[in-house]
């Protein structure tokens, strides 16, 4: 499959472990693709929930997906600074329809002031039982929480101010073509 290129628009589909569609983002602009990663941006992007509800993202957000890490990162660019929403999720795969991944409930939120919170621990516990996450899966996800927190603490990749500046600037250049 041919990788999307800079300026292309793609759909992103989030699934649950049982295979059910969880959420869809329409028209994410691709900023960069490599063999293992995709960087994009959502800006007033239509989101459709599994129950059919629809909403539109409020602010520009740089999105980061990787084929080797069990998380993806959304950097929301707001007036008071950048805040992050990080999904513990399978590495992504891409087909002709969309970029796809499995959402594993746990999320890490990083506020603009640097405060970090692990979210949806109860939901993870419920789904772990209902959808029968294996012990290996549980271990992988918990290890990836540690990796993610390390990235946050060391301002690695998407958590670097320079990264956000570079990719947001590139988005504005592409948007205004």
UniProtKB/Swiss-Prot annotation:
The family database entries (Gene3D superfamilies) matched by this protein are listed as: FomD-like
Q: Pfam families recorded for this chain?
A: DUF402 (PF04167)
Task: Return the broad EC class.
Answer: hydrolase
**Residues binding Mg(2+) 2, per UniProt:** 105, 107, 120, 123
Q: Which UniProt keywords apply?
A: Hydrolase, Magnesium, Metal-binding
Sequence intervals crossing the membrane: none
Entry EC no(s) = 3.6.1.15, 3.6.1.6
Q: Binding of Mg(2+) 1: at which residues?
A: 87, 103, 107
List of catalytic residues: 23 (proton donor)
Q: Which GO terms describe its molecular function?
A: magnesium ion binding; nucleoside diphosphate phosphatase activity; ribonucleoside triphosphate phosphatase activity
Q: What does the record give as cofactor?
A: Mg(2+)
Reaction it catalyzes: a ribonucleoside 5'-triphosphate + H2O = a ribonucleoside 5'-diphosphate + phosphate + H(+); a ribonucleoside 5'-diphosphate + H2O = a ribonucleoside 5'-phosphate + phosphate + H(+)
The UniProt family comment states: Belongs to the Ntdp family.
Q: Which NCBIfam families match?
A: PRK13662.1
> What role is this protein assigned?
Has nucleoside phosphatase activity towards nucleoside triphosphates and nucleoside diphosphates.
Q: What is this protein called?
A: Nucleoside triphosphate/diphosphate phosphatase
Q: Which organism is it from?
A: Streptococcus pyogenes serotype M3 (strain ATCC BAA-595 / MGAS315)
């Amino acid at each position: 499959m041919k990788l999307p290129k800079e300026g292309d628009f793609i759909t992103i589909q989030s699934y649950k472990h049982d295979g059910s569609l969880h959420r869809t983002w329409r028209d994410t602009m691709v900023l960069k693709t490599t063999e293992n990663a995709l960087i994009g941006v959502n800006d007033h992007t239509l989101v459709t929930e599994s129950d059919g509800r629809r909403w539109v993202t409020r602010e520009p957000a740089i999105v980061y997906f990787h084929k080797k890490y069990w998380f993806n990162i959304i950097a929301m660019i707001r007036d008071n600074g950048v805040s992050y929403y990080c999904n513990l999720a399978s590495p992504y795969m891409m087909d002709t329809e969309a970029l796809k991944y499995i959402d594993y409930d746990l999320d890490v939120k990083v506020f603009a002031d640097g405060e970090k919170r692990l979210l949806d621990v109860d939901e993870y516990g419920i789904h772990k039982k209902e959808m029968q996450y294996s012990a290996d899966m549980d271990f992988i996800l918990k290890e990836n929480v540690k990796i993610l927190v390390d990235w946050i603490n060391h301002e690695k990749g998407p958590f670097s101010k320079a990264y956000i500046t570079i990719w947001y600037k590139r988005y504005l250049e592409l948007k205004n073509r």
